[in-house]
Amino acid sequence: MFLLLLLWSCSNEDNNSEVENGTNPAPNLKSVGKSANDFLSDDKYQSLAVEVFYVGNLQPNAQTLQNLKSFMEARLHKPGGITIAVKQIASPAGTPYTINEVADIESDIRTNYNREDTLSLFILFLDGNFSSDTGTTLTLGAAYRNTSCVLFENSIQALSNSPTEPSRTDLETIVIEHELCHMLGLVDLGSPMQTNHLDSAHGKHCINPDCLMYYQTESNIQNMMNSGMPTLDANCLADLQANGGK
């Protein structure tokens, strides 16, 4: 079974609608990586407001969200602080989901958009699975806009918390940090590479099999879990720092 951490483009960019008043979606409808510097630096945004939505009883573990916040605090210059709001929704009952259906769900439920000095991030934990899954592939998450990503929590739960699998918290953390890093511009998506480390055979991923941004299969995840949680390697960190990050 191959586990996929995906990158999709679902942008609707309109350069004439850049008013950032907290209710205008346009600045948050760009392609993945377009807001990399906005996340990493405090040149434009001094704060980050994260909205986490989950379906039914599929709430992410509290430790997962704490891990995410710690990860962001270690990499992003946000002197005004990072907040995370968690909200429950009813099942959209549309599984399997296409990326356009995920984007439609976001349009229905997202309440925060960029405003003044605060950048907004949308994270959705969905039931069901992704439409491109097959008998041998399973998608765990996808970044699909500059400030939007989805995690398929049913799939994550099916592959965690057994004696031979990673804990649910660890697997959620891997997926959410991986997708966030695509929005931070890794690799070569908006944070230019300082050294070539692009795995061109697998899209915008890192060639280092020990890096968080490696194109991951089940065996890769298991190997990394056996040796501890995966982290960003030196090349990925250099890219983020060169684009305004810590």
Please report, for each region that a protein language model flagged, where it lies by residue.
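Short, cationic low-complexity segments
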Residues: 144-154, 232-246
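Sec-dependent signal peptide recognition
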Residues: 1-3
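Propeptide-to-catalytic entry region of secreted or membrane-anchored zinc metalloproteases
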Residues: 11-130
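The catalytic-center signature of Zn2+-dependent metalloproteases
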Residues: 163-235
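Active-site-proximal segment of zinc-dependent metalloprotease catalytic domains
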Residues: 115-194
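Sec-exported extracytoplasmic/periplasmic mature domains
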Residues: 72-81, 182-189, 241, 245
